[in-house]
Amino acid sequence: SLSRAGDINKQVFLDHAERVAHIAYHLGRKLDWTEAELNELVLSALLHDVGILTSDEQLALADLEPVRERVSAHCLRGYRLVRSISLFSGLARNVLEHHDYYSPNLRPIPAVLHVADRVDIILKKDTYYLWQVEDILAYFTHRQGDVFSPEVVEALRRVAQTPSFWLDLQHRNYQYAAGRSSFRRKLT
């Protein structure tokens, strides 16, 4: 039924958001971010695609080289929505800028979100993640300084050397909280 299709679409969205939060959290840790910075990063990761309204928009974002016009609409809608909720309004710019290409003026959280989002899009979910690390790193290395922040790509290289990062990601054992509040979420 149509409502079941909507539920599946929501689950795909939630799974993507949690994987991006896991990836972003580990990148932020490699960048030596504070607990407060990591918390803002994780919340922004969980909300980054809240502006997506249709499955067509989801499919457009799955393109490895997304066209800026196709991604900017969901970023702007997400920005407006997040800004309208007082509890999350401070995260709105991160949602707006999470597909922005690298520039020296790009704020750090959107730069990390951009890399984390693309890592999740690139990963072939039906293939062992550890077998894909070399290709993923080549993709980002080729585009660092142009599309992606060199500092964040270097953090990705360091994270990628840890097999448990990829295993946790593949087996949905997400870790994305800082400090004493750290927890792991095992989804079944």
Q: Where in the sequence are the language-model features?
A:
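Histidine- and acidic-residue-rich, metal-dependent catalytic cores
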Residues: 1-188
